[in-house]
UniProtKB/Swiss-Prot annotation:
Species for this entry: Drosophila persimilis (Fruit fly)
Composition-biased stretches (Basic and acidic residues): 107-178
Record's compositionally biased regions (Acidic residues): 85-95
Subunit structure: Interacts with Atg9; the interaction is transient.
InterPro entries referenced in this protein's UniProt entry, alphabetically: DDRGK_dom-contain, DDRGK_domain-containing, WH-like_DNA-bd_sf, WH_DNA-bd_sf
Record's function text: Substrate adapter for ufmylation, the covalent attachment of the ubiquitin-like modifier UFM1 to substrate proteins. Required for ufmylation of Atg9; protects the nervous system during aging, possibly by stabilizing Atg9 and supporting its function.
Family, as annotated: Belongs to the DDRGK1 family.
Lumenal side: 1-2
Keywords: Endoplasmic reticulum, Membrane, Transmembrane, Transmembrane helix, Ubl conjugation pathway
UniProt protein name: DDRGK domain-containing protein 1
Xref: SMART domains: DDRGK (SM01128)
Keyword Transmembrane annotated: yes
Gene this chain is encoded by: Ddrgk1
Segments of skewed composition (Low complexity): 53-84
Amino acid sequence: MDLIILVGIASALLVVILTIFFLQKKKGGTEAKEAAAPPQRGVPLRAQEGVPRRAQIARNQRNRLRQNAPAAAPAAAAALQAADAEGDNDDENPDGDGQRMPQGAVLDEKMGAKKRAKMEAKEQKRLHREQELIDREQRKVKEAKEEAERKQQEDFQEEADRKRAEAERLVKEERERKEHEEYLKMKAGFSVEEEGFEEGDADDQDNLLADFIQYIKDNKVVLLEDLAVAFKLKTQQAIERIQDLQANGTLTGVIDDRGKFIYVSEEELAAVAKFIKQRGRVSIVELAESSNNLINLTPVSAGAGEGSS
């Protein structure tokens, strides 16, 4: 009886030991097969090894571009965001031939030279497009700055022109005011006291001044004493009147040492100046001879009489 029990116990232990042995052997073979099995084709090796994906590398490159071009931030940022989305879509969507773009080491190991060149060209094209966007925005900023500077320069020039015109207007008004004061002073001098006419109204004084000027222009060469007698003035008063008229530009001419005033018109002065300019250096004798031809000293009344005869 005891022998049977011992044999049964020994048999049970043997069965247990054999079962454990076969289980361990089976488990070891499964692990060896799994270790020897190659990685799956659908999962990139770079992803299995923890290497960053292509999209992450592209984002890093775009971040560096953003740091190098801060001036083009507003519009370029939107373009770069669109490029990011496009890059993500490229990662998620297959290429034109229906295959996903290989990543990392798979790109080098499994992609042929032609396919790799195509992918590199595509990447270069994308980077070139992003750089063009940045350059375009920088160019717009530069053009806007130049336009602002040009507008500022135009405003400055307009302000300078306005100030210059204002200064010229003030000078002209001051000159006209002085000429008017000299005219009034000269007109008041024509009112004679004991030797001439009684003082008339303003119209009479204007007419008297106009007659005085016209008398000199008509006679061309006027003896100052005769001029004073004609207008009931003293000789010195007549000389002062002529000097005042010369000062304000009403009369042009010279008073010689014989007591005569020779009237020369603006046109005759211009003709003499033109002659001197054309001839260059001119002697006094040549100038005197030419002046006799350029300056008409014949009285108007005498010239009219000769023309009618």
